[in-house]
Every structure is written in structure tokens, then in C-alpha cells.
């Protein structure tokens, strides 16, 4: 299914959620090939709701009768209600509560999205419990399920800009307790995959963006408010969240023993300076910067994902145009920045 490449703006949240959850033909085929229900752990985050809706839409288009179940504490009743409207079953659960976790329904396919990033500094113990201990509990609960587990490109550490991105085979050098705990998550999944013969794919995402949240939005909001744009992290990757979701769902079919790793990121090496200047032109506003670019950044090479799943449908340039129109119209955005400029791993 093709997103209109000439669309210059997205009208409202309803249209945005429709586009974000539009499955690709490859995603439809991938879910048609899988048997059993799909359980999404940690569905209440930024990416979870529309990924769950995409899974439901793709399954229906494939003619597959499948339960798609979203699990979260659901601090937002609105999120829970919206998922139900979309046909996604919801279950409230504190995943760290072993009894509640083990009472969840069986599912042949599991998407693991639970984790803690923002607020991890000062709550290091909870961060490690969520990011490293919980994966072990999930593997104990679902030892026979196929799992696609979200991780982060932060586990690589800083990559020379000249290299244009870390590859899955590169050595890991996580900075800060958040990134270290995410590596812990990966190692726990790898351990259970090896010892329990569990089919697992680990997805290193870097970074999913849409109109309401993401690194591109952070830069755009600073330019629109005529605030200085930090250049300490001078380069980045960004991928339309709908494309990231499509690839993540397809990754279930590539789960293996031992677990495999797939980077999910945009194909472009994006300069923060150039992004800001482009937004300045779109908004017709002056652009100010603070600091200077370093010769390294958090960057991922997603070439393997493109070989497996195809290239993203939405380019960074298209995404930036949509974001600019969204902000200029006063569209709703998250009040929580991504803190993409953080170089020491303190979130």
C-alpha cells in the first residue's frame, strides 16, 4: 500500500493515526504467514498503539482471524479506549508483577516494547528492573512464543560520522545506565534464545518519528520558537514511525535461534544543521545554533533491514514537510523532548 508521495500535509490526528497504521503489502504477507495470536507488551508507549492497529489491519486484510492484544498499565484511559475502538483487545497489567504477568493469555507471537528511558537517571534500579530483569520474566512466561523485542541504537555508543552508521556486527559500547541496561535486555533475550531454543529477533531502533513526537519534531519546535538548536549531536537517523512499525511486524517472521539483531533506522545521514535550516526556510524564520558538531554521533546503518523489508515509504524530506505544516497549524505535540542531543547517556 502506497502513501501519497505528493501529500504536503496531514489534516488531523485521525488522518495521522490512519497513515501511521497503514500496513505495507509485505507486512500483510508476513502476518498471513504467521499462525496464532499476537500479544504486544508495553503497548501504551509512543509507537505501540498504531503498531497494534497496523497488526490488526494487516491480519484482517490477510484474511487471518487473530487476536491482537495490547498490554500496558494504561495510565491514559484515552489510549486504552482508542485501541479498543480499533479492534485491539486491551489488558491492564504491571508486567513486573510476576502473578499478573503469568496470568496473561497465551500467544504464539509477542512484540516486546516495554522499557524505561526517560527518568532513568535517579531511578537506576527501576531502569535495570524494567530493561534487564523483566525480559527474563517474559521469556519464562512465553518460552514457546516467537518474540520481536525492541532495543535501541544507543547500545552501539557513538559512531564516527565518516562511517555513516553502526552495523549489527559492530562491537557495542553503551554509554550511561540506560544504554547499559538495554544491552542487558538484549543479553537476557539472547541467553533464553540459546538455552531455551526460543525464536527471537532484537530490533535496534534509531529513531522513529511522526508529527507529535521525535527528533525531527524537536528540531522543528526549536526553530519555530526561534530558540537555539544544539549541535552537540550534529547528525542523526530518523524513520517514519509507520515504516518502523511495518518493519518490526515483519521481523517476527525472521526470529531465530540464536536470536538475531536487526537495525531499524532511516536511510539518510541527516545533519541537524541542515534540518534546522530547512525548517527555517519552511517557517520563514531565522535559525540560531549553539555549540558545534562533533565528529561522532549515535548513528545506525539499517542496510540489512532494507534488504529484508524494503526501503521506507516516507523520506525524511517528506516527513519534515508534514511536521512543518503540522506545527504551523498548531497540531498537538508531545511536551516530552527526545533529548537526542544527550551525548553522555543520561536520560
Residue ranges and their predicted role:
Residues 37-57:
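N-terminal Rossmann NAD(P)H-binding glycine-rich loop of SDR-like oxidoreductase domains
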